[in-house]
From Swiss-Prot:
PANTHER family: RIBOSOME MATURATION FACTOR RIMP. Belongs to the RimP family. The keyword Repressor does not apply. It holds the Pfam family RimP_N. One of its GO terms (cellular component) is cytosol. It is found in: Cytoplasm. GO terms for biological process: ribosomal small subunit assembly; translation. It comes from Azoarcus sp. (strain BH72). Disulfide bonds: none annotated. This is Ribosome maturation factor RimP. SUPFAM superfamilies: YhbC-like, C-terminal domain, YhbC-like, N-terminal domain. It comes from the Bacteria.
Length: 144
């Protein structure tokens, strides 16, 4: 069910001109969380627009759910796609790998971009090349 609903959400969100950052479906499928972004920043009106459109589409497609939440990804936005790592080059991120590099799985540093399907991160210890397929989790580090 999740893959089908996620594809439907992706079509609706991108059709409205937004980027689907993340999608969560609760274990029982009762709560749908949709995180959207747009270059200029997400407003409450953007969330309402996407929510209204998804509600209509879910009704037509007979998607069974109790609650729909649409929001921005926040300041600590997750980085999910290779394009995200290119877009946010120059910003500080936290990175968790599925396999350790030098007995370490968690890294913090300035994102340098992407090189040959690897994410380039400048840490205190130097440059780190993290293969994209080994990235378990990555987030922006908010600046205050």
């Amino acid at each position: 069910m999740q893959a089908g609903v996620e594809n439907l959400v992706e079509q609706v969100v991108s059709g409205l001109g937004y980027e689907l950052v993340d999608f969560e479906l609760s274990p029982k499928g009762r709560l749908l969380r949709v995180f959207i972004d747009i270059e200029r920043g997400v407003t409450v009106d953007d969330c309402a627009t996407v929510s209204n459109q998804l509600t209509r589409v879910f009704e037509v497609e007979n998607v069974d759910y109790d609650r729909l939440e649409v929001s921005s990804p926040g300041l600590d936005r997750p980085l999910k796609k290779l394009a995200d790592f290119e877009r946010f080059a120059g910003q500080e991120i936290q990175l968790r790998l599925s396999l350790p590099i030098g007995n370490q799985r968690n890294f913090v540093g300035v994102l340098q971009g992407v090189r040959e399907s690897s994410v380039v991160l400048l840490t205190e210890k130097g440059e780190l090349l993290a293969p994209f397929e080994e990235i378990e989790k990555a987030r922006l580090v908010p600046k205050f």
